[in-house]
Amino acid sequence: MNLPYVDTSALAKWYVSEPGSEAFESFVQEFPRVVISRLTMVELRCLLARRRRAGDITEATAEGAFQLFQGDVARGHLEVHPVGDQHVMGAVALLGHLRAHPLRTLDALHLAVAQATESRIVATADRVMARAAEALGIRAVTFG
């Protein structure tokens, strides 16, 4: 079974209730597990801290969400792939190939990992990333 690659903008909807959370929950339950990168761990921790500082969530909610995330990693619900030099160079190539798409650095890295894992689906809440994935022949599913 080909597993979808899930970026942080979509995965956050699993741990923090926000627009698109219910749709993402339905999507993710269609698969035995989903693919993320090690980068997602850093981005999710940052996202939770940013929302805590903004007053959108409490410290307890932020810590609880990250603990749930770590539990999902430990149980194998999230298949974590490392980010290596080959992915960095892949992102560089993607940015050259996808010049019409205003991809951000980390989104290019996410797409490079998605390509390396041969995911045929990318889940994201980022419309720019979704369009870039589609340009690569990867089906994008957007949330939010």
How would you describe each model-predicted region?
Residues 1-42, 47, 51-64, 136-138:
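Short, well-structured N-terminal submotif of metal-dependent ribonuclease cores
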Residues 19-22, 102, 142-143:
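Hydrophobic/basic alpha-helical segments enriched in Actinobacteria
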Residues 20-22, 67, 108-111:
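A generic local structural motif
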Residues 45-94, 135:
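Active-site-proximal, substrate-binding regions of enzyme catalytic domains
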Residues 75-131:
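Active-site neighborhoods of divalent-metal-dependent phosphate/nucleic-acid chemistry enzymes
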Residues 80-83, 140-144:
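Short acidic-hydrophobic, aromatic-tinged amphipathic segments that line or gate anion-handling sites
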Residues 127, 136-141:
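C-terminal binding/interaction regions
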